[in-house]
Amino acid sequence: MSVTYFISDLHLSADRQDISECLFRFLENEAIHADALYILGDLFEVWIGDDDISPFSESVASALKTLSLSVPIYFIHGNRDFAIRQAFADKAGMTILPEQHVIDLYGRRALLMHGDELCTRDIEYQKFRKKSRGWWWPRLMLMLPLKTRQKIAKNGRETSKNNQKQLTADIMDVTQSEVELAMQHHDVDLLIHGHTHRPAVHEFTVLERRMTRIVLGDWYDQGSILIAGQEGLALENRVF
């Protein structure tokens, strides 16, 4: 049976071995039989550069590389791991895709993205996103010593947590008009994304065209997977 898997928002870190162990089981037992695996951002809790090598990141790269020998792996940057560059992608056997990418999913055009660009009501975050995805800011950051980047990342995570406490759930969710604009721009009726940690299937109509938006779940409490095949699409969980 032909299937394609989509995952996002794993937020892998060395202090959450239960998440990485669940991922490794999924790669070894399920993804190995797939046509392809798409990772739609936030694979890691934080990524400050491909030079931040650790036994943990190496174990993740090794597991992905093993899968890539049989199954193509595609990756779209998230807001936590936008600093992943070609060096790590090569080590992990991943192909880096543009921020918004259209694929043929068993005869249906599907738009893939991490999804943070759709949350336009979070104005402060969008300002940061524009800066951090520009050409100069990432280059400047990657020129800093590794320890300096580690301190900046730690402070940034603490600031982000404090800011999120002050934001309403509505602000942190996608803006429907942005969803519709993106889908119309790419001429698709299926959008798959992550970021919001609110797994669901949303159906709506735009100009008499039926649209579907599928939101992938996070991996904090269980693995969250979208399975796509000729028979349809299904969101499923995997226990730790």
What are these regions (language model features)?
Residues 2-3, 12-105:
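Core catalytic region of metal-dependent phosphoesterases/phosphodiesterases
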Residues 43-67, 165-191:
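N-terminal short leaders/motifs
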Residues 115-174:
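Active-site-proximal loop/helix segment associated with metal-binding centers of metalloenzymes
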Residues 8-11, 42-43, 79-81, 115-117, ...:
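Active-site metal-binding loops of divalent metal-dependent hydrolases
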Residues 1-2, 240:
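Short, Lys/Arg-enriched, disordered terminal segments
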Residues 93-98, 111, 116, 122-126, ...:
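Conserved beta-sheet core of the metallophosphoesterase superfamily
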Residues 4-6, 37-39, 111, 192:
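Residue-level marker for buried hydrophobic side chains located in beta-strands
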